[in-house]
């Protein structure tokens, strides 16, 4: 939804439409390229972060990235270094195949699912236990 702004300059009254100037995000969310972001400086497990983001907005999930410019935008609004990304179980759920092309039917990964955090200082993605606690940035498409 667009926003209208009323401005009065002396005897001139002007209405400005702000529709089309960016994503229509809730007032406490930041917008970038048609998505809404909200930074939460609250440490929680990955499962709790996923649930928490959905509670903040029904279409929201821990952040994921489509470009380095998006990372730069997010880093500009962060006040902490490590945060959950919307990616989990990277080893147990991958569709793996052996070097000869046959499907991997037997797996012996650790039982602990793996999740991913982003280190904002150098944009490195790190695999870590989903049971650890980190901050979260929630994201949804506007």
Swiss-Prot record:
GO cellular component: extracellular region
UniProt-annotated location(s): Secreted
Gene Ontology MF terms in the entry: carbohydrate binding; toxin activity
SMART domains: CLECT
The keyword Hydrolase is assigned to this record: no
A Pfam match: Lectin_C
Signal peptide coordinates: 1-23
Tissue and organ distribution: Expressed by the venom gland.
Residue ranges annotated for the C-type lectin domain, each copy included: 32-139
Superkingdom of the source species: Eukaryota
PROSITE patterns cross-referenced by the UniProt entry: C_TYPE_LECTIN_1, C_TYPE_LECTIN_2
Keywords tagged on the record: Disulfide bond, Hemostasis impairing toxin, Lectin, Secreted, Signal, Toxin
Disulfide bond annotation, renumbered to this chain: 25-36, 53-138, 115-130
Main localization, broad class: secreted
InterPro entries: C-type_lectin-like, C-type_lectin-like/link_sf, C-type_lectin/snaclec_domain, C-type_lectin_CS, CTDL_fold
KW Secreted (keyword) present: yes
Similarity-based family: Belongs to the snaclec family.
Role summary: Interferes with one step of hemostasis (modulation of platelet aggregation, or coagulation cascade, for example).
Complex formation: Heteromultimer; disulfide-linked.
Protein name, per record: C-type lectin 13
Organism: Crotalus adamanteus
